[in-house]
Amino acid sequence: MTTANSEEKTYPIFTVRWLSVHALGIPTIFFLGAITAMQFIQR
């Protein structure tokens, strides 16, 4: 955090980490909501 020279040159935000977080986070929340809704609809 003190010296961010190498990190500023490359963009660590738009990398595999960003893709994995969004590719695994959004669908997980969506599926969790769908499963919860189905549980309430069944009974």
UniProtKB/Swiss-Prot annotation:
Chief localization: plastid
UniProt GO cellular component terms: chloroplast thylakoid membrane; photosystem II reaction center
Annotated heme binding sites: H22
Cofactor(s) required for function per UniProt: heme b
Domain of life: Eukaryota
Disulfide-bond pairs as recorded: none
Residue stretches spanning the membrane: 18-34
Cofactor note: With its partner (PsbE) binds heme. PSII binds additional chlorophylls, carotenoids and specific lipids.
One of the protein's GO biological processes: photosynthetic electron transport chain
Membrane topology: Single-pass membrane protein
Location relative to the cell: Plastid, Chloroplast thylakoid membrane
Keywords: Chloroplast, Electron transport, Heme, Iron, Membrane, Metal-binding, Photosynthesis, Photosystem II, Plastid, Thylakoid, Transmembrane, Transmembrane helix, Transport
Molecular function as annotated in GO: electron transfer activity; heme binding; iron ion binding
InterPro entries associated with the record: PSII_cyt_b559_bsu, PSII_cyt_b559_CS, PSII_cyt_b559_N
PROSITE patterns per record: CYTOCHROME_B559 (PS00537)
Protein's job: This b-type cytochrome is tightly associated with the reaction center of photosystem II (PSII). PSII is a light-driven water:plastoquinone oxidoreductase that uses light energy to abstract electrons from H(2)O, generating O(2) and a proton gradient subsequently used for ATP formation. It consists of a core antenna complex that captures photons, and an electron transfer chain that converts photonic excitation into a charge separation.
Record note on quaternary structure: Heterodimer of an alpha subunit and a beta subunit. PSII is composed of 1 copy each of membrane proteins PsbA, PsbB, PsbC, PsbD, PsbE, PsbF, PsbH, PsbI, PsbJ, PsbK, PsbL, PsbM, PsbT, PsbX, PsbY, PsbZ, Psb30/Ycf12, at least 3 peripheral proteins of the oxygen-evolving complex and a large number of cofactors. It forms dimeric complexes.
Family assignment from sequence similarity: Belongs to the PsbE/PsbF family.
Name assigned to this protein: Cytochrome b559 subunit beta
High-level lineage: Eukaryota, Viridiplantae, Chlorophyta, core chlorophytes, Chlorophyceae
